[in-house]
């Protein structure tokens, strides 16, 4: 494996330790973060995107964006980055659309093709060849059905607008034995009971 990215949610706290471990293992470290993007229509339902640092300038810009979100724009404890902040400080950053959790994915999930096209063209205009449409496959059967429908639509838009696709997997733990511990953590964060069979199950072993 020539390179590896670490993308925690809304922080770069693991960057130094990750850098040292990666270098010691002969692996190129890539810094980045999953970030909350403010939803103009509803502050309670932010979008999620993935930002990766291309160079030192990108790392500096991502650090500043995260700090600004924590200091100026928290909603229910979630630090949210405004879209125009990213557009003003995009140098050195690569952006992935967030699959079904991003604004484009949500629009496609609602079958709002024209609005999704308009949104992706806006990001392409700013980031040019540093913008990627993201696809994922994980979660329970119901979620996978939505993913498959999304993938079919996003492949069409990617080809139509000459935007590259990238497949990612939201890896949360290294060993399958850690699955139950991670589920417990997820339940605590979301206010669900581990024994509740009706609760959302967003991850698998």
For the regions a protein language model found, what residue spans apply to each?
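Phosphodiester-processing cores and adjacent nucleic acid-binding clamps
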Residues: 1-205
């Amino acid at each position: 494996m020539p390179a590896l990215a670490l993308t925690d949610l809304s922080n770069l706290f693991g960057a130094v330790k990750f850098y040292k471990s990666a270098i010691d293992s002969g692996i190129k470290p890539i810094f980045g973060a999953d970030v909350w993007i403010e939803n103009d229509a509803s502050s309670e339902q932010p979008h999620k995107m993935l930002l990766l640092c291309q160079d030192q300038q990108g790392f500096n810009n991502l650090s500043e964006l995260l700090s600004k979100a924590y200091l100026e724009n928290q909603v229910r404890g979630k630090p949210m980055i405004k879209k125009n902040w990213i557009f003003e400080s995009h140098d050195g950053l690569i952006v992935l659309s967030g699959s079904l959790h991003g604004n484009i994915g949500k629009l496609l999930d609602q079958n709002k093709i024209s609005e999704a096209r308009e949104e992706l063209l806006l990001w392409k205009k700013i980031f040019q060849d540093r913008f990627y449409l993201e696809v994922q496959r994980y979660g329970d059967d119901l979620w996978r059905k939505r993913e498959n429908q999304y993938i079919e639509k996003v492949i069409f838009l990617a080809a139509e607008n000459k935007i590259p696709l990238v497949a990612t997997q939201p890896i949360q733990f290294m060993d399958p034995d850690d699955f139950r511990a991670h589920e417990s953590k997820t339940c605590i964060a979301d206010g669900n009971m581990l024994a509740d069979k009706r609760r959302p199950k967003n991850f698998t072993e």
